[in-house]
């Protein structure tokens, strides 16, 4: 680009093109297609999924989710569809046939035919096990992992095995109305799982709730707990990321210079900092590292350090709040082939070390099939138990762990390593209790204090557009269903958060190009999220089937656009759910425990009593945390999948203005955002 053209673009405030059209051809890697440019073969409704069918009446090319959601009711249900093979299908045939998200490629079509002919989840498990074996053969190539999972991610069931079995047998599909006094099928199954994880009776008196398929499937996405040596490397990584200014140097609108050169300089600087910190902490080990002057010769060290950081963050979402974003952006650029060439072929990315892969490498997968694993991984909680009961459960659990470690130990798999795998699965149960259970409690509170069929005077959930900041217009019943369905969706998302996080990192670190753009929330990297998108559509479809055909609101999932630019933003957004809901649940549970006479009098005089105060808090949350507000403009607001959580963010930001805010403070509330330390 000539200097005159550059000057013209500067005067026109068109700086984005100047940054993209740098002289260095490497920078073209980071360009992206214009948002307005239509991609042929994509769904005309959501625009981010491949079109699978054509409606002969509407003449629209649609994906599986959009075609079924848009034609659920009314005269559209009688429309005829034609799939990519030329077959004509009515709505019922389409809904029955397309139970899975769309597959692509010859290998995917073969898998799909197997599913249609056999309808057997064992085929899926076999395919997944073969795929995971191929990971071990390609440990140093993240692109091979991405291509491998691109065809199989939609086969991986986002719910436990018995969830799928129950639904295929026809359960839960006839009840389309939410009843205040009856539990739906999804909640009953989740309660069975919760009883397994948090058993209150004697440990030995139990019926196995979770099959070996559940442990095998979940273990594919459960990271291995860090050992002491890895924790030392983690401290080095956190210190290096804390002082790094990587995103400040790279993610900027830069008029001149080569972006690839800046990336190369920053990556070399990060490697140098890590090497220096290692020398300072362990001179003997650091001396061996610095003897190799080329960073490529220390590739294994850098791969292990960054993998440890990724694994630690997944297991502890509240940790590395600022450092994790820097690390992912750094690795995202390091995955680019041109950047690797500038670093002498240095590859900083390796597959995540999960329980399944760890056991598979050491021929220990039989551990996941042992019925005793249920007892060994169950949580011991102190609620409503005496001290002798707690101590007995602890002894029984420890005995089960020791038995399994002796039974499956070998020359390739030590007993200590088996215990680490078992404790890692226990960490997954703890994650579910801390993150998913608040959503389940909010669903119970919704059912306990509100009825979908009639509203109590002064506690109606009805919304009207423009009143109280609402951008939706719902009557009481519709808003009740909308809240219930949103909470059910969040519950399923958090249930499979490890799986979503696993594939989110694959989307981020696969080497796909991104576009640096101002999304209204600052400069963000807009990148497509194919694997996360497929899993999210599968979760959405499962949720819609469980709550019935009467789905309220939009089914559009924003991924890879200005609302949710990339998988990193997606993960960060949905890990906030428990931070929003947990303080509300704690406050509601705290209110009946208040015994101070002055506080009791204050609540009675101001709010009308503890019961009324509870209803006021819940009514305000269920109304205005789900009213479609929170976006920068009208078009981005509403009832889409992403917008439901955006409204909850907006409500939490205004908590200090609520009349019941002092009650939150009394319960120990300090904020919804958690700690960044």
Curated annotation (Swiss-Prot):
The keyword Disulfide bond does not apply. It comes from Dictyostelium discoideum. InterPro entries: DUF2009, Znf_B-box. Residues 113-126 have a biased composition (Low complexity). This is UPF0652 protein. Residues 91-111 have a biased composition (Basic and acidic residues). A zinc finger (B box-type) spans 38-84. It comes from the Eukaryota. Keywords: Metal-binding, Zinc, Zinc-finger. Transmembrane segments: none annotated. Zn(2+) binds at residues 43, 46, 66, 71. Residues 163-178 have a biased composition (Polar residues). GO terms for molecular function: zinc ion binding. Residues 91-142, 156-192 are annotated as: Disordered. Belongs to the UPF0652 family. The keyword RNA-binding does not apply.
């Amino acid at each position: 680009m000539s200097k005159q053209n550059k000057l013209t673009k500067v005067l026109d405030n068109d700086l984005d093109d100047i940054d993209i059209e740098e002289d260095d051809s490497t920078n073209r890697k980071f360009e992206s297609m214009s948002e307005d440019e239509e991609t042929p073969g994509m769904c005309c409704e959501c625009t981010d999924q491949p079109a699978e069918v054509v409606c002969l009446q509407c003449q629209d090319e649609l994906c599986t989710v959009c075609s079924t959601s848009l034609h659920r009711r009314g005269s559209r249900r009688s429309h005829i569809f034609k799939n990519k093979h030329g077959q004509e299908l009515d709505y019922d045939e389409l809904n029955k046939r397309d139970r899975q998200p769309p597959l692509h490629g010859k290998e995917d079509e073969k898998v799909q035919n197997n599913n249609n002919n056999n309808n057997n989840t064992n085929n899926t498990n076999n395919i997944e096990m073969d795929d995971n074996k191929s990971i071990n053969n390609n440990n140093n190539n993240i692109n091979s992992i991405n291509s491998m999972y691109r065809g199989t991610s939609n086969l991986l069931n986002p719910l436990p095995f018995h969830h799928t079995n129950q639904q295929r047998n026809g359960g839960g599909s006839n009840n389309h109305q939410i009843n205040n006094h009856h539990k739906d099928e999804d909640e009953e199954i989740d309660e069975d799982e919760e009883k397994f994880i948090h058993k209150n009776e004697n440990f030995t008196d139990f019926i196995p709730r979770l099959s070996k398929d559940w442990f095998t499937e979940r273990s594919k996405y459960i990271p291995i707990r860090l050992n002491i040596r890895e924790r030392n490397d983690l401290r080095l990584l956190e210190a290096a990321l804390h002082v790094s200014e990587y995103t400040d140097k790279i993610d900027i609108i830069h008029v001149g210079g080569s972006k690839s050169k800046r990336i190369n300089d920053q990556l070399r600087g990060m490697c140098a900092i890590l090497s220096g910190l290692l020398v300072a902490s362990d001179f003997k080990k650091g001396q061996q590292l610095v003897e190799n002057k080329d960073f490529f010769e220390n590739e294994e060290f850098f791969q292990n350090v960054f993998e440890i950081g990724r694994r630690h963050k997944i297991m502890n979402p509240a940790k590395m709040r600022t450092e994790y974003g820097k690390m992912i952006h750094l690795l995202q650029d390091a995955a680019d082939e041109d950047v690797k060439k500038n670093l002498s072929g240095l590859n900083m990315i390796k597959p995540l070390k999960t329980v399944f892969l760890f056991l598979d490498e050491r021929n220990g997968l039989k551990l996941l099939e042992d019925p005793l694993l249920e007892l060994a991984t169950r949580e011991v909680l102190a609620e409503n138990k005496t001290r002798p009961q707690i101590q007995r459960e602890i002894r029984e659990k420890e005995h089960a762990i020791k038995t399994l470690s002796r039974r499956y130990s070998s020359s390739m798999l030590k007993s200590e390593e088996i215990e680490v795998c078992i404790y890692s699965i226990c960490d997954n149960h703890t994650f579910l209790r801390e993150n998913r259970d608040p959503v389940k409690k909010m669903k119970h509170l919704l059912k306990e204090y509100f009825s979908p069929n009639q509203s109590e005077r002064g506690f109606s959930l009805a919304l009207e557009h423009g009143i109280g900041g609402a951008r939706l217009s719902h009557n009481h019943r519709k808003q009740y269903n909308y809240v219930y369905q949103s909470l059910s969706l969040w519950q399923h998302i958090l249930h499979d958060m490890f799986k979503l996080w696993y594939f989110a990192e694959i989307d981020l670190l696969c080497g796909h190009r991104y576009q640096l753009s101002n999304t209204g929330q600052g400069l963000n990297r807009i990148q497509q999220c194919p694997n996360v998108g497929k899993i999210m559509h599968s979760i959405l479809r499962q949720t819609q089937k469980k709550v019935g055909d009467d789905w309220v609101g939009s089914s559009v999932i924003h991924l890879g656009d200005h609302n949710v630019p990339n998988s990193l933003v997606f993960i960060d957004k949905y890990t906030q759910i428990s931070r929003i809901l947990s303080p509300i649940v704690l406050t509601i549970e705290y209110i009946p425990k208040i015994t101070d006479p002055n506080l009791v009098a204050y609540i009675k005089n101001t709010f009308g009593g503890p019961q009324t105060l509870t209803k006021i808090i819940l009514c305000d949350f269920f109304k205005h945390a789900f009213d479609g507000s929170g976006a920068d403009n009208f078009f981005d607001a509403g009832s889409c999948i992403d917008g439901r959580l955006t409204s909850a963010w907006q409500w939490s930001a205004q908590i200090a203005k609520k009349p019941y805010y002092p009650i939150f403070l009394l319960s120990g509330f300090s904020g919804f955002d958690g700690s960044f330390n």
